[in-house]
């Protein structure tokens, strides 16, 4: 309630109590009374604002308790990367780092853009092969893959293949390699409208090498969901483990593994249907392994025109490793986890001078056992203090509000001092904005060394950070440099897809949506109301409305008729959606459908319709 309205109500109440009418109450009171009522209404307005602030703080605390950092923390961007191994059947490591320097527009000084290093790391230790897909043949077409994104037609090819058959010529990059084991292919289609149909046919694909059947396994060439005994014994599954599992599940449908061993042999030893590839095989510098993929005949070549087959690809996320070497004393030691203007993501390891791995625990009570490390972050860990940014913001607001009161004294010296103070405050405020001085508490470790062993020894502390939203929209084709620890791949790696999905820490509005979804659905999506709550929680401010209807569709299979569906119509918020790139919006929609299908118990398929 505004100060003028409060004063008006108090005046009316006072007039009735003292026997004055409404028409004469303005002129009947002494000016001192009016000044006192002014002061009273001003203080009451401040009390009202404090009550609103208290409500906000209570809601913030409740949300922090209900949704810890694992749920509402920052999410790294993810993408698909290609890297060529030096040796055959080498595994990538979760510790590997591929980096690129990105220039970010500086709104405060456009002539001095900000340079930020974006680091990407694998989410799965897949095996890479010393081979690449060199030729693709279907219908009347034979293409040579010139690089990862373009293919050139071979014009002297005159043969026509049966409908639904695709031949791949896989080039061996190493002269010492004569066979490939568990070759993994990344298969993607550029046209979103054909994606559902193509993936339906892709699941029915059969593979052969010279009439010998090849076992095709959907997914990666290493297990995704395996039981990690070390993780269970030594530490809890962390936020980073959940993120990597989510990324692996998201890209799972695009990877196919040819199980077993593919051996190289001369083209003349293949059956007669491969004789049309003799010219390109003999003219190629390196040996080729030819495989045949058989799809249903209803797969038209117009769909295959938009399909790419790529080897040596794997999912990556934006995470950067930090290492601290610190000598600790004989009692409890504190180590701040600095991230250089990035967002803290997760802990990796704490190792003492005797190579002992310390167990990393969440802060629960004041007792810390010897040989343990405790991670403390903001939120639930601190109830009785505000962060430095909150205190600074409070001081800025207070001095802005009260400076007008001092200026009313009319003294030139005080007025000039207040002008100078306001200028300094404006400079501090701009500096805080430029440095992204957010209301978040920097995490830190509390380490209690083992007695008589690790005292005075150097500890090695490894942890991860992410650029969150700043890591989004790195374009496909971006070349990344490999760090020194990436020995088994070439010095350069290439992005196959744009980076998408990076999110900063959720604000209170997003937390309320997540809280509402958790209360309504309890982790299960059954009713239309559950779908609606899940939709708002996923798309957040990018949509205004959601409508759920029952519908029908024609099945993709030529042998099936119509089937019932659940149609989800979302109305987008155009002003908010304009801030997203096309790839980011496509990722939002695709991840929404995948998460909805995995969490829902509905037997009917879902369809998503976008209403502008």
Language-model segments: residues:
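Intrinsically disordered, low-complexity, polar/charged repeat-rich segments
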Residues: 1-612
